[in-house]
Structure formats: structure tokens, C-alpha cells
């Protein structure tokens, strides 16, 4: 059958003849081996409504604390699995080791079952996908490298195999820049495939810090983040030089990063508020003791804040890299009840001269996106507001993407799951108009107005 993804038909991530390129983000599905039917319905409806070029999963696909992983689960990466602790306390025999290995094999089968249910709708429609990790995936007892290896067993997965850098199956002509599990980059070419217009960077933003709170990207991942825009430009230039009508490639390819944790600077999209102010939310850890509301001058209509932004305690320097190395947007998950889009100014004071021209294209600053859970297996907003996020790029202004939440209530209807549970929303629901409808679906009111104009 003909792939739903235009890029899959072309064999690479590429802008269409229409000048558009679409990414669908799914985050914090966070379920066990039996994925909620409502989650699958949301995925299917979102794919059919948006026809994305690629789907990006931004972490916590696996609820590593699920009872299915009771024999192998671990709370922290540096701690032993529960099964290992129990066996050590009772026996050091080879029999105990065999029992634990059998438990690990059951965990692998359970993780494989979760992944299969999540990506089957994508495979059925011929849509490529990529995945990074959060703070719960590894808790099942498998490392991110092994989970990534399981993901690569399924068609359409673009996560690179350490043995090679070429994406296979759906996108045989796609270049992939690899770093480590969950951290890699995918260039997106122009309509003629003569140059790279932008890059999609997936970043493993870490899990937990030994000092407390959430972790940060590894030093290697941060170095990769800083260098990949120039790496993409160098690779693209080699292709450009062999193309007769080639356009000059910039020193760096502007990029957008997708990751699990928001960075501390997301708080720049908020403003302090009185404890009893309407829709005020207390900050998280380092920001605790103060209350905040969204800054309407910095965020788009329809944004809502349902919980404190749960960022790492330490500033890893990631934001400075995004500012200075050619990034125009960051999209994160993790906070299941937050859904907002805003822009913060970019400081160019210490930018490399080579980056000046690239940064000048990012005229609006750095776009920062927070998305609610796409799943029904854990906490979140009311079930009708669990959502996928569409991000649409236009070749005329590729570094100013438009984005839209695709909520279950609008796409599917009334959820059937009794498993999903919601914390009380302390912010207003999405207003009637969230801005432009990227799906271009006429409402009954717009149909009536159109009829009256005839």
C-alpha cells in the first residue's frame, strides 16, 4: 500500500511540493504491556488527521514501575534491580541467576509487546518514527540501549544501529547523525533534495541525578547537541557541491530538539503570581515556594499550565547551547498536565561569528513547547484533553513552525478507559479558538458562514 507519509514515499525526510513538512509528537504514553485502547485510538486518529512525515516519541513510553516488571524493576539507574536484590539476599547460586535472567526475558517480551502496540498503527500506514527516552523507561530493568534495540525490530524505526549510520526500510536515503541511545539527528532536505533546510534532533535528556531531582543529558550528548548543526551543514555541502543548480549551504543547519525533560528556562514563559491568584501553580523543587501563571505576552492562546514545570535542579548548559549553536525550537514532555507554546529571546552576545547568519534567521527567539500526555495509563488532564501534537513546517518560513494539539475529545470523542485518572486542572481549558487549525477541518459554524456568503 502507498505510505501515508510523503517522506516515506520519497525515501527521505523532505519538504513536499506543497512546501510543507509535518512532525507528530507523542509523549508520556507511560503504559504497561497491555496499552490502553484509548491510547491506540488517539494514535490512529492523529495519524489519519495529520498524515505526518515522521512521528517522534519523546520519552516514557514504558511505565517501568508497572507490576509486569516487578521482578526486574529498579528505581534508579545506579541501583540494582529488585529481583537481583532479592536473589542476593537469599542465594548466590547459578539457579538464582537463571531465575533472574528468565525474569529479564519476560521483561523484554513485555517491552516488545508495548512497542508493538504503539507502532502498529504507524506500520499499517507506512509512517517512519523515532524515539528518545524519559525517566521511567529504564525502570523496567532494561537499559535504554536494549530498549532502543527492541524498537529497531519494528518497521519504520529511524533510531540508528551502532553498527551503521544509514536509516533503512522506510527512508533508505535518509542520513542519520548518531551519538548514543536516544540521541541522534535527522536532517530534512528541501523540495529538490539539494540542501538540508533544518534538522530534527532527538536528545536523551537523562533520568535522575544522584544529588536528587531529575538528571541531565550526558556530557557526550551535550557535545553532540552543540556540534550537530555544523555537522549537518558540512555533510549537506558535500552533496550541494555535486549538484549543478546547488544553492550555497550555510555554516550550520538550524535545528529543533525533541526531548523528555523541559529545561529550567521554561520558567521564563511564566510570571510570578500570588498564591491565591487564579490558575496559579507552585513551582517545582528549586522553584518551590513561589507560584506562577503563564505569561500571556510570551505564550500562545490556548496554552495552559496544570502543574509546576518539573525540570532538573542543575542547569546543564543545554539552553546556552540552544541559544548559541543554531537552534530555533525545543519540544518537551514529562509534565503530563502542561500544554503551552511560547518564545523567549535568544542572547547572541557570545555567539560564534560563524553562527551569526544562522541565528539571524531565528528572528522570533527560541520557541519552547510543552505537551501533555498522549496516554491513558497514568495521571494527566481530563481524558478528553490527552493529546498528540502536530508541528508543521513551511518552506517559506521553516524556522517558525506552527503547532496544534490534537485532543482525544475532538478527534475521537468520549474515552472508554476507566484506567486514566486526572488531577484537578487549575487552569482554564482551551478556549474556543486556539488559533489556526492546521487540519483545515471546517466547523459547522464556518460551513454556515460559507453558505451565507454564497
Segments the model singles out, each with a brief description of its role:
Residues 1-109:
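N-terminal active-site segment of His-dependent metallophosphoesterases
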Residues 9, 80-249, 368:
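Extended active-site neighborhood of metal-dependent phosphoesterases/phosphodiesterases
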Residues 19-22, 50-55, 123-130, 196-198, ...:
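Loop/turn elements at helix/coil->beta-strand transitions in domains of secreted/extracellular proteins
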Residues 20-30, 197-207, 258, 367-373:
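Active-site-proximal beta-strand elements of phosphoester/diester hydrolases
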Residues 28, 43, 55, 60, ...:
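Divalent metal-coordination and catalytic microenvironments
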Residues 32-34, 63-66, 131-142, 208-211, ...:
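Active-site environment of divalent metal-dependent phosphoester hydrolases
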Residues 51-53, 199-202, 213-339:
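His/acidic metal-ligating clusters that form di-metal
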Residues 188-189, 304, 310, 338-446, ...:
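Binuclear metal-dependent phosphoesterase catalytic core
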Amino acid at each position: 500500500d502507498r505510505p501515508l507519509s510523503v517522506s516515506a514515499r520519497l525515501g527521505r525526510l523532505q519538504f513536499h511540493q506543497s512546501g510543507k513538512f509535518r512532525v507528530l509528537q507523542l509523549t508520556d504514553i507511560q503504559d504497561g504491556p497491555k496499552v490502553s485502547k484509548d491510547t491506540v485510538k488517539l494514535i490512529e486518529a492523529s495519524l489519519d488527521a495529520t498524515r505526518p512525515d515522521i512521528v517522534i516519541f519523546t520519552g516514557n513510553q514504558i511505565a517501568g514501575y508497572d507490576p509486569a516488571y516487578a521482578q526486574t524493576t529498579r528505581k534508579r539507574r545506579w541501583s540494582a534491580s529488585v529481583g537481583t536484590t532479592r536473589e542476593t539476599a537469599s542465594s548466590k547460586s547459578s539457579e538464582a541467576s537463571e531465575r533472574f535472567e528468565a525474569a529479564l526475558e519476560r521483561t523484554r517480551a513485555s517491552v516488545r509487546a508495548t512497542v508493538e502496540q504503539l507502532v502498529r498503527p504507524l506500520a499499517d500506514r507506512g509512517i517512519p518514527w523515532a524515539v528518545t527516552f524519559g525517566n521511567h523507561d529504564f525502570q523496567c530493568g532494561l537499559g535504554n540501549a536494549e530498549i532502543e534495540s527492541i524498537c529497531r525490530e519494528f518497521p519504520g524505526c529511524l533510531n540508528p544501529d551502532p553498527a551503521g549510520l544509514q536509516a533503512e526500510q522506510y527512508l533508505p536515503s535518509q542520513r542519520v547523525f548518531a551519538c548514543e541511545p536516544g540521541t541522534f539527528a535527522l536532517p530534512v532536505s528541501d523540495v529538490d533534495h539539494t540542501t538540508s533546510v533544518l534538522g530534527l534532533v532527538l536528545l536523551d535528556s537523562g533520568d535522575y541525578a544522584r544529588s536528587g531531582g531529575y538528571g541531565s543529558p550526558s556530557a557526550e550528548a551535550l557535545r553532540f547537541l552543540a556540534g550537530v548543526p555544523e555537522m549537518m551543514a558540512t555533510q549537506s555541502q558535500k552533496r550541494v557541491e555535486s549538484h549543478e543548480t546547488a544553492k550555497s549551504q550555510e555554516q550550520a543547519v538550524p535545528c529543533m530538539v525533541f526531548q523528555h525533560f523541559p529545561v529550567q528556562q521554561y520558567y521564563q514563559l511564566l510570571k510570578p503570581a500570588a498564591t491565591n491568584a487564579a490558575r496559579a501553580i507552585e513551582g517545582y523543587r528549586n522553584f518551590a515556594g513561589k507560584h506562577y501563571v503563564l505569561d500571556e505576552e510570551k505564550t500562545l492562546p490556548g496554552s495552559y499550565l496544570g502543574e509546576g514545570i518539573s525540570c532538573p535542579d542543575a542547569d546543564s548548559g543545554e539552553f546556552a547551547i540552544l541559544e548559541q549553536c543554531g537552534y530555533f525550537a525545543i519540544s518537551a514532555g514529562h509534565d503530563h498536565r502542561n500544554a503551552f507554546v511560547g518564545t523567549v529571546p535568544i542572547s547572541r552576545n557570545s555567539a560564534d561569528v560563524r553562527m551569526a547568519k544562522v541565528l539571524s534567521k531565528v528572528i522570533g527567539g527560541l520557541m519552547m513547547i510543552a505537551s501533555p500526555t498522549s496516554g491513558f495509563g497514568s495521571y494527566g488532564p481530563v481524558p478528553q484533553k490527552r493529546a498528540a501534537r502536530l508541528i508543521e513546517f513551511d518552506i517559506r518560513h521553516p524556522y517558525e513552525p506552527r503547532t496544534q494539539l490534537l485532543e482525544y475529545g475532538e478527534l475521537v470523542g468520549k474515552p472508554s478507559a476507566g484506567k486514566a485518572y486526572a488531577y484537578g486542572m487549575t487552569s482554564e481549558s482551551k478556549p474556543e479558538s486556539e488559533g489556526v487549525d492546521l487540519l483545515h477541518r471546517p466547523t459547522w459554524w464556518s460551513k454556515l458562514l460559507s453558505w451565507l456568503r454564497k
